[in-house]
Amino acid sequence: SSTSRGLGDVYKRQALLHDVGKTKELSSFPLNDYTDEGQLLGHIIIGAQMIHDLAKEIPDFPEMLENQLVHCILAHHGELEYGSPKKPALAEAVALNLADNTDARMETLTEIFAADKGKKEWLGYNRLFESNLRRTGDV
């Protein structure tokens, strides 16, 4: 059915849309600073509002699909203490949180390795990863 097909597409849509609020949270180049809206609301709330507003402009947009997309945006940081107003309650939201967290951790790891480029393979203990980190290959 079109409903089940629409729900299956939530994975793709939320992967593309989860940080859409950053387009209004941050000012454009060269400033790259937080806007007033960004400071007051943050990209999660801004993004949820954007999706809600866009869904209302599309005739017969399924309310359940809108709610699922908005939920994925609201829950993509995973925990209340990390800025999510909601914890993931859908499989799609859990998957998005795991992917977003993995992406952020890998970016952090890349930055750690780049900063310690002159060091040998073992970089020592890292509090964020709670582990002794070792460089492998060209990373």
Regions found by a protein language model. Name each.
Residues S1-Y11:
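Single conserved hydrophobic/aromatic residue that forms the stacking wall/gate
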Residues D9-E25:
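Conserved active-site beta-strand-loop modules that form the wall/rim of enzyme catalytic pockets
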Residues K12, E25-D36, K56-K117:
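Histidine/acidic-rich helix-loop-helix segments that form or flank divalent-metal centers
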Residues Q14-D19, L41-L80, L128-G137:
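Histidine- and acidic-residue-rich, metal-dependent catalytic cores
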Residues N97, A115, K119-R127, T136-V139:
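N-terminal intrinsically disordered, cationic/polar leader segments
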